[in-house]
């Protein structure tokens, strides 16, 4: 009886002392695969947003422009007159005012795409 109790205690100690890496590795591998998938989706989404916002315009914020349709972005406008314009957003410190400016610029840019070719032909 003492021998069976000793064997049982030794077995329990052996099981408790053995490493449990078999359970942790698949979880780490699964998390790494999920992270890689999320990073790929984020890159694809960023590229899709850039492609969608730059259908016509090819100039980024800070570059010179002639018409707003040259600027890349839904709310980015060509600020300035003639050939001295710069692609940028109109800014205000008021949050509600900024939302209204973004909405106005989006509508103006959308309507401006219809007459963009005519505006650019004047400066060529």
From Swiss-Prot:
Please give the residues making up the propeptide in this record.
Answer: 18-52
Q: Tell me which positions the record assigns to the signal sequence.
A: 1-17
Expression tissues: Expressed by the venom gland.
Q: Which residues form a coiled coil?
A: none
Give the domain of life.
Eukaryota
GO CC terms of this entry = extracellular region
- Which cysteine pairs are joined by S-S bonds? 54-72, 65-78, 69-116, 71-87
Where does it primarily localize?
Answer: secreted
Give the location in the cell. Answer: Secreted
Keywords, A to Z, come to: Cleavage on pair of basic residues, Disulfide bond, Knottin, Secreted, Signal
Q: What is known of its domains?
A: The presence of a 'disulfide through disulfide knot' structurally defines this protein as a knottin.
* Function field: No toxicity is observed upon intracranial injection into mice and intrathorax injection into crickets.
Which family would the database say this protein is a member of? Belongs to the neurotoxin 03 (Tx2) family. 03 subfamily.
Q: What is this protein called?
A: U13-hexatoxin-Mg1a
Q: Which organism is it from?
A: Macrothele gigas
